[in-house]
Amino acid sequence: MTSSAFDSSRQGCGSGQCACRRAAQTRRADPFDDTDYGTPTRHADTDVTLDIDGRAIAVPAGTSVMRAAIEAGINVPKLCATDSLEPFGSCRLCLVEIEGRRGYPASCTTPVEAGMKVRTQSDRLQALRRNVMELYISDHPLDCLTCAANGDCELQDMAGAVGLREVRYGFDGKNHLSDAKDESNPYFSYDPSKCIVCNRCVRACEETQGTFALTIASRGFESRVAASAGEAFMDSECVSCGACVAACPTATLVEKSVARLGQPEHEIVTTCAYCGVGCALKAEMKGEQVVRMTPHKNGLANEGHACVKGRFAWGYATHKDRITKPMIREKITDAWREVSWDEAIGYAAARFRRIQDEHGRDSIGGITSSRCTNEETYLVQKLVRAAFGNNNVDTCARVCHSPTGYGLKTTLGESAGTQTFASVGSADVIVVIGANPTDGHPVFGSRLKRRVREGAQLIVVDPRRIDLVDGPHVKAVHHLQLRPGTNVALVNALAHVIVTEGLVDEAFVAERCEPQAFDVWRAFAARPENSPEATADIAGVPADAVRAAARLYATGGRAAIFYGLGVTEHAQGSTMVMGIANLAMATGNLGIEGAGVNPLRGQNNVQGSCDMGSFPHELPGYRHIGDAAVRARFDEAWSTTLQPEPGLRIPNMFDAALDGSFKGLYCQGEDIVQSDPNTQHVAAALASLDCLVVQDIFLNETAKYAHVFLPGATFLEKDGTFTNAERRISRVRRAMRPLSGYADWEVTLMLSRALGYDMHYAHPSEIMDEIARLTPTFAGVSYALLDELGSVQWPCNDAAPQGTPTMHVDQFVRGKGKFVITQYIASPEKVTPRYPLILTTGRILSQYNVGAQTRRTENVRWHGEDRLEIHPHDANDRGIRTGDWVGVASRAGQTVLRALVTERMQPGVVYTTFHFPESGANVITTDSSDWATNCPEYKVTAVQVAPVAQPSEWQRAYTRFRAEQLALLEQRTAERAPAIATGK
């Protein structure tokens, strides 16, 4: 969406009349309309009426003639035009006649005018179009019957549309029919012999993705699409988002899965199960088999775009490692035994009940998954509270965004972000703190880059030199490259400038915020120790840069902050979130389009798992378990008596397991061994349990310690909803039958029933209906509404029946905004002569979280191992070169990684990812955590790095344990084989 679709002034937006909201309302009219209108929609305050083929048609000013015609049901042939890209006018197929104008203008590049008279059909136009098509066909292979795009080819369709039945030009002259294919990319092929040089792929790479990896090389007849400097796609800057493939009107760029399986027969609109962007996708199917995944053009979170993971990395769903039958064993040293669902569920329930009989009601608990649906996480927390009879339930949000919930609820009154992703298109200043959107949230990252190319000014706060700092046609105005662990010192310095230089929005603060709290905060921020000069030595950021960034944020127009785990995963994570909220309130950057505070949540349903009451102290809707009135409402609905005391958090569960008071755990869709800090501590805790029940699709690192394995279902095998980082609730629709026979919600129902607490639901829609009855912010949510609108952002209730795109418009959820003192306290993780470097961790584009899904796809071609990034200065001091094996040691443990020497790092800081279990990234992270929420401090670990020649002791032990567990899994298969053979 271009900036012209938004009102860029600070006033007026938020009334419901701004262009961006009208756009949303227009698009919501039919969220499943897949028509390609040729050029993007335009929004204007006035309509223009024109005549097309004798019909009076009214459209917004600025609309192209092509779009006006197609919206009216008048077909105009086109090849270079598509409504996801700006008009280009190169194919000359969409020519029309306009009364009073000479020649035949291209309808895609011609805007409508009042009183204009247009003809789209005439003998002359038909002849011109046929001649254009003949020229295209004259240099195009005539292998339609065997072509992968047969039946889904715009060139083929347009040849029919213009009535082309024969070609006068032969293939005797020079042509491109023998040009070599590029098969280097694992997901799609490039066949230049079929290219018509329409530029759609190049424009998609530039406009939609913003990578600028493609170009048109040479001129005239020699023109061809080239990746970077004529490299193979796999060796180029291409990030395999698939935008070029989606844009291609021929078989020049085509998915290899389509070439292999043929054209899909039907499609199901669903929601991606990777990051927190929540892209709407179409699962294009042939029977029960996925042929391809394509971005849904009307998905409001992604607007027809996707990334390499959502677009292509879906093969894990049918990977050979999938476990589809329940398994049990007495001890973790025993071989697994495949059993029926009834036996597995009964075995798990009996062991849980025995534990509670021997060790008490609070000796067991559950962990929900941020990869499962809202309905499934709701059921797990309900099972724990009603069937287990305690509040020992937690979620992986504990180890990522729990400080977001605490910090935003304290200051603003709600545990969620304030904007839509689309509203970045009306931001004048964009601040990215502790996030790497181009890797972690790539579709939103592309939107952000587009807005920066349009003129928004970008501030990046990050220890690393991420792509946004200086990428293709995108450059940050300020990069505040702070030292890890000093976030709060820096945010206080920014606040100091805003307060002492008179940049506070006094009117906003007086009207919207608690005056006493603001006065106290203002005095705190103005203290000399919070000045940029005083904090420069702490954070490592020059005072002049801090002052310039603060001034830009406060005075540059609508300013939006987007932050990630680089904010939350710190000992002062909650403090930093509140510091960010302080900045937004002080400058009035809340409650309007293009401004706000937005956590970029990492997994597909982190927001939803929190919304559904997955924390030990909160019920669905973030209502405290200690509130008797709230408890009474749930007691009545659930026919039970809830306990008033908060239960154990995940770290507390581990500690209690090691001291013998916590003996059983139900873990759904979460690999805590690989993802939680201090792996040795986690593994020891799980090994001490009497019963660990894991529900997952693979035998992950946690499942290797399990006594019961309940096979899970992928997002393709279930119905439900996900809630993305912008509070958008979207439908997940089943595209194939669960390979195990049951969706995850059905398994939880069976376990609850076996425990003596029966829950009755025939479909996830009934679970959502119950959520709506019990949760005020979800009161208006239903599957019928989601099917009507496509998606909805909570709060959705009587006050906001179609959802709430922008939070805190007239007042904060808590009434008045609350400024909070954010005193900087140094991290307990300090560099010493023994551990002189700081390790910080994160993600990379091609992999996802612990990698269980992406490691089982071709994405390993881009990132097949975790590497340690280190600055040349630190590498030279240690005699380290790229590719060398290096030992990384902390006070918690040691592992060995391959080095990558890069100036993306600053001296004194090293970085790695955590996608591969054998890397042991969390062997070296420690127990240091956020003071308010226990969110681990993954971003600050003091380490030493040195060249080594062999794996670490932990890696050798891990390799042995993994081999033992896989052997026990194989024994299960070997033991069953004779019985199966005999049965046949």
Residue ranges of predicted features:
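Short beta-alpha connecting loops at secondary-structure transitions
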Residues: 51, 114-120, 230, 474-482, ...
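Long, contiguous, secondary-structure-rich segments that constitute the structural scaffold
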Residues: 738, 742-792, 798, 858-869, ...
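Catalytic alpha/large subunits of respiratory electron-transfer oxidoreductases
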Residues: 141, 198, 203, 259-718, ...
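Long, low-complexity segments enriched in small/aliphatic residues
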Residues: 600, 607-610, 615, 764-858
